[in-house]
């Protein structure tokens, strides 16, 4: 099976699980923490066109809409997009455009967005460098890319080497229903990660190099991004059930404005 289709099949199987979890997140402290972080990186302009790249169930698309952005959310998984639309209806929201689309081949005109947000997406892509090129292409001058991710692939490889077990990797004590998080699904996730080239890179240093090569001049890195969340409190049982054994990092990059030639 082609890698992109294999990745799509895996995440589509988990789409209902993600929709339930993200809906809960919209009614938790996590929402306020993410709103604070995103707000601090939005461009200083009245009307902001925002792209949620790898929107999943739409959690961040809804947050950016609350912050006054005109939002488009894309995901390769049609199942994820369907769930994002369902959550939008459940919330009584409207106005967000959710589209099935490949992050590595964006169907948008150049300079269509002022702000591009992504979390836990680049590590899942067969060609993340191409995804960055596409983000740069559709980002308007003065716009910002804000990417949260982690070295998940390397962590999953380590799990496999240490001998992953279902008891260690899957928790049902949180109240979340995780039908897709079986041992078979976890092994499939790890096998996919092992075949993705990005999982052999040193991140976020690799991300910085790619963004700089595209022409980004102002790049900010936070190696301890997770410290902005959970309110300084111990990780809850719900979070333990969704635990990923890798530290979250942030990469923010701003595209230069056009300079007038004399």
Language model: regions and residue ranges:
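Short alpha-helix
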Residues: 197-215, 221
């Amino acid at each position: 099976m082609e890698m992109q289709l294999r990745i799509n099949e895996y995440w589509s199987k988990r789409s209902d699980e993600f929709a339930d979890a993200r809906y809960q997140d919209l009614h938790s402290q996590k929402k306020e923490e993410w709103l604070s972080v995103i707000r601090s990186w939005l461009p200083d302009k009245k009307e902001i066109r925002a792209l949620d790249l790898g929107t999943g169930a739409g959690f961040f698309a809804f947050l950016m809409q609350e912050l006054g952005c005109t939002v488009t959310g894309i995901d390769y998984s049609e199942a994820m997009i369907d769930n994002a639309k369902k959550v939008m209806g459940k919330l009584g929201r409207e106005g967000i455009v959710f589209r099935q689309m490949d992050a590595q081949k964006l169907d948008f005109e150049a300079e269509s967005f002022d702000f591009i947000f992504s979390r836990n997406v680049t590590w899942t892509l067969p060609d993340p460098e191409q995804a960055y090129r596409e983000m740069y292409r559709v980002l308007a001058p003065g716009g910002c890319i804000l990417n949260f991710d982690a070295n998940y692939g390397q962590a999953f490889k380590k799990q496999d080497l240490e001998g992953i077990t279902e008891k260690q990797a899957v928790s049902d004590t949180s109240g979340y229903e995780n039908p897709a998080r079986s041992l078979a699904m976890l092994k499939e996730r790890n096998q996919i990660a092992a075949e993705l080239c990005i999982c052999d890179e040193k991140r976020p240093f690799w991300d910085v190099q790619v963004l700089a090569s595209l022409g980004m001049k102002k790049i900010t890195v936070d190696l301890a991004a997770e410290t902005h969340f959970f309110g300084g409190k111990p990780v809850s049982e719900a979070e333990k059930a969704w635990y990923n054994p890798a530290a979250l990092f942030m990469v923010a990059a701003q595209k230069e404005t056009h300079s007038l030639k004399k």
